[in-house]
UniProtKB/Swiss-Prot annotation:
Biased composition (Basic and acidic residues): 52-70
Keyword Transmembrane: yes
Gene: ANTR6
Domain of life: Eukaryota
The protein, known as: Probable anion transporter 6, chloroplastic
GO biological process per UniProt: defense response
Amino acid sequence: MARLTLRPHNHFFSSPIYAHKQPFLSVYTIFPHHHQNPLIKSRVKCSASGTERVRESKKLPPKDPIEDPKPQLPIPEVLSTETGFEQNWPPWKNIPQRYKLIGATSLAFVICNMDKVNLSIAIIPMSHQFGWSSSVAGLVQSSFFWGYALSQLPGGWLSKIFGGRKVLEIGVFTWSFATALVPLLAGFMPGLIFSRILVGIGEGVSPSAATDLIARTIPVKERSRAVGFVFGGLSLGSVMGLLLAPPIIETFNWESVFYLFGLLGVGWFVGFQFLNEEEVSYKGNEISTSHKSENATKEELGSSLKEIPWKSFFQSPAVWAMIYTHFCGSWGHYTCLSWLPTYFSEALSLNLTEAAWVSILPPLASIVVTSLASQFADYLITNGVDTTTVRKICQTIAFVAPAICMTLSSVDIGLPPWEIVGILTAGLALSSFALSGLYCTHQDISPEYASILLGITNTVGAVPGIVGVALTGFLLDSTHSWTMSLFVPSIFFYLTGTVVWLAFASSEPQTFRKEDS
């Protein structure tokens, strides 16, 4: 019998700081020697108190002396799951679960806008192939917003009942599947419109689902960065969609864009199933586990809908401020998203290739601004600045900056085209400060009802996608003026939205009670 005692001190297997948390660590090692000598198997046990014992030391039976086995290679140490390399592999193993969820949600939003903008590129060859007029092409593109507007409130309600995680993954699968259906239904107009409505429904429930997920997993001091990171995926998705769609269409055909982009969403849905950790709910500064029911009965769903304090929502000036501000921001966003490429081509005399590349600049710059704005907001909150003040500062920048830039672009002061492009890009990029202003306020005032509140404001915010885009075209035909049709309405809503926001917005937690309804 051989006895071996090892006394580890301050190596990577054990740490004196955490010794009281781990009662013992067990390490098994087989020491190879010359082939004529037997192997010695030892077990080393390191207790929390620092004492060691050799519980067993056993001499193995010698091998047949006739045999001349090859020298045995060292056998690696088998480590417990709480020590050594297994503790840090894979690299993302020790990343907090809430950050994994936020990263996956941001990726979903990247795919979201890729599937939103792909039609704006593919509509050109589709119109040529099927002989669509501009009115028909406009009808196909606007059908997305029908589903988007109709799904906002249901998305918020379902997120409240089942949790944002479940609603988000169903939304991603719905819009991805519907995207892949477009080539199959393109020759049948009702079917094509229905598929785009489904895309709108799937994408429409996602903002509320993400808001619920953020409200339940991210503390206030990290919330601006989380919202900026998640919703910033929309800008990245616009850039990637506008960059990838043209070469895919030129290399293959327009159908391949919908198949490939739809497949990305299905792949995300499959991968998201591996994030099975439970959600956490922030109540004040504490974290408590929250399990959502996935088998609610119809009676429970109906009861939960009745329990939502709808009247209390609409009695709050802060909620009305969010509603109008969301409408104003969406007017500028959707009208510019739809009409700026045409403006660059007609008013600034850029060719189609230049106009397409220039259209990428605002969302590309928004990615940088979003990161800076979120860090700026969280820095102010961490250093004691009132949350309401921070939200008002950020939202004011988001509205005043594009209003000034649009004014400079619309006034004939002899600016060359590329300077106008730069001014508009800067203004629209700075509007991303809204992600640290308006879009954080839903979680600030009520984490419990954040998804429903965003559903309310986003429903109103979807109206400019239907009305504003069409009205801009009508005004352009009537006045033949880009200033009056595109810029003046946007400037009006930006400025009035700023006034309402500064007067009535609040990030103070509010209690919405059913008995008040």
